[in-house]
Amino acid sequence: MKSLKKMMGGLCLMCAVAGCSAPAAKDATTSETNTKDGTNAVIENILSRRSIRKYLPQAVNRDTMQIILNCGINAPNGQNKQSWEVRVVDNPDFINGLTEVYKKENPQAANEPGFKNMFRNAPTVVFVANDGAYDFSQVDCGLLGGNMMLSAWSMGIGSCCLGGPARFMTDSPAAAEYLKKLDFPEGYKLLFCIAFGYPDETPAAKPRNAAKVRFIE
């Protein structure tokens, strides 16, 4: 029975990975119909996604994170340069050690209710760096991040894109030790972080301003 469960689990992971990497032919008529009657799973996932700022302590297992990362690197990007560098940290010593450095320079942060770490208490953090020599690298990195967050949400994993911790790590000399551990190549700069974990909240949707989008005749 255990062997059967392991085999089925492996098949599920393979299917999820294939979903992020294998091209699939679509019937345009069927896709449009599914969208109109509300059965399009991709659109449903996009519209239901929320930024999560409260997490359960359980880290996301690495097999699941590998699926999320694979979806990320399959994002569209300019000239297929793949102008990103990605690092994943689920080591509490790294996260807590960096948080202690952060607290020394921002003592008020520790007074926030429920504060445990500077990544919204997430147990897993992804660090994304862009290539400073390529104009559109930041765009590429943003597309990569969006893919990761949406794929995570489809598997019940929450996320939150964080700019503040990245800025702290690049600006504070006290954080240099931790930035060095990420081992980014020369010319790459930490752009943002993404917190990942199992949600411990169910936030409501925030309003979007549809007036910012217009068709031009």
Predicted regions and their residues:
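Acidic, surface-exposed loops and disordered segments
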Residues: 2, 7-15, 19-217
